[in-house]
Amino acid sequence: MNSEVERPSFLSLPDEIILSCLARISRSYYPKLSLVCKTFRTLLISNELIVARLHLKTHETFCHVCLKFPDKPNPSMFTLWIKPGTILTNQLEKNKRSTRDTRLVQIPSSYYYNVPFYLVMVGSEVYGLSQRNDPSSNMFVRNKGDIFLCKAPNMTVARAKASAVVFNGKIYVMGGCMADESVNWGEVFDIKTQTWEALPDPGPEFRFSSIRKIDVFQEKLYVRSNEKKDSVYDPKEEWRVVKGLDMLNRNLGCGTIEIVHYGGKLLILWDKVDLSHDKDIWCAVIALEKRHGSDEVWGNIEWADIVLTVPSSYVFVNSLETGF
């Protein structure tokens, strides 16, 4: 009696061996691998895979983006994919379509983000600032082990949709109030003393009430506004203009802007209406440097390209950098 010998399947291997194999593969391929089978989907989002990548020292820096589309009830998650071996170039002002070497690839996920707070984490505590349209000076805090947010010391001025960042164990908050409120335009919360202190006045050139994002880079705070102005604040020094980004500013227009700390550099995302009235999401990676013999801060565009085309009615929800 003849019978076919069943060939062994990769999935017949123990999970530990599959995890070891997945940990050696670039995360650029994870979105496609997650579509192969349920086992892969489960392992690719497991904590065990993170541990394996850290142990093998194969962890990578990736940028994730959450977008909301009009025809879908929940937001969709994307990750920035860069074709291995690609020589990245600056495509700004070249009137070319995407090279397709850099793309935002959708991640199968049930992730849903709908929290009316701007959340920042300090140690084991999560602090929240209101993101509603009505100005509020309230701040809330929750320990990781708790369920509910508790009241924290109020800010010195009411703010609507302010931006914040954690730096050296302190929470820096800027914007969300009238630009002429120079005394309170920016303030910093000391976690240890539980007190607020006003930041130095950046002057009328930088004092804009609508801020897109604050990020920490090379021990300084990098601020991007809706008015297409870039500035850097050194808590030990003063505010400075970021030079060398004129080409970037000409291309940003009034599109949605997001800034992510990406592998020691700054990653900026924005959108522009294309010829078909959809929107192209652009991505640029910026390296900042302080020129020798000068206090000037310069930005260098390492690469820029279209990474995704979306309906014009889409909504940019948030972005996140991960490193594993």
UniProtKB/Swiss-Prot annotation:
Kelch repeat placement: 170-216
GO cellular component: cytosol
Family matches, as SMART domains: FBOX
Keyword vocabulary terms for this entry: Kelch repeat
Chain segments annotated as transmembrane: none
Domain of life: Eukaryota
Keyword NADP: no
Domain F-box: 7-54
Annotated protein name in UniProt: Putative F-box/kelch-repeat protein At5g28160
